[in-house]
């Protein structure tokens, strides 16, 4: 058994100190999952369906804001091939990550919003600006997207009491 020593640091909002080593590990993991999201956006921009698929686990599930569901690389490849070759041809996809939560050391849940600009889809659809939740899983040291669940943005209307 080895003795390990850690610096303890206080993070605003937490009631107990956190090991500095754990914080550094979480920052590295966060950078890694954000890199996958950036690679996904870059592949979309390039119209590179194989690049999009490379960001996903082989058994990934994608649910689009239009309600399309694709399971596994082949269905996802077909879905993105039709979409990026059709109504979203020449479009850009920009993700803004709102929150990253590590459920375990190897599972991350990301909440964000995406904006699709350019192409017929963006011009004609209210779904061009939507929210999403991605689940990423690390296997063999590599982070990949296991689930994409995109959904329409909505606004809550507050009733006025008269």
What are these regions (language model features)?
Residues 2-54, 61-162:
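A beta-strand edge to alpha-helix "cap/lid" segment located at domain peripheries
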């Amino acid at each position: 058994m080895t003795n390990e020593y850690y610096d303890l640091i206080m993070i605003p909002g937490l009631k107990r100190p956190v090991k500095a080593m754990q914080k550094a590990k979480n920052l590295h993991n966060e950078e890694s999952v954000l890199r996958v999201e950036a690679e996904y956006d870059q592949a979309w921009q390039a119209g590179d369906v194989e690049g999009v698929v490379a960001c996903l686990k082989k058994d990934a599930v994608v649910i689009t804001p239009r309600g399309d569901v694709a399971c596994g690389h082949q269905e996802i490849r077909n879905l993105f091939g039709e979409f990026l070759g059709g109504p979203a041809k020449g479009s850009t996809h920009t993700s803004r990550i709102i929150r990253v939560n590590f459920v375990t050391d190897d599972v991350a849940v990301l909440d964000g919003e995406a904006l699709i600009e350019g192409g017929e889809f963006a011009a004609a659809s209210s779904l061009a600006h939507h929210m999403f939740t991605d689940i990423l899983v690390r296997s063999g040291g590599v982070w990949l997207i296991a689930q994409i669940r995109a959904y329409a943005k909505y606004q809550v209307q507050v009733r006025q009491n008269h």
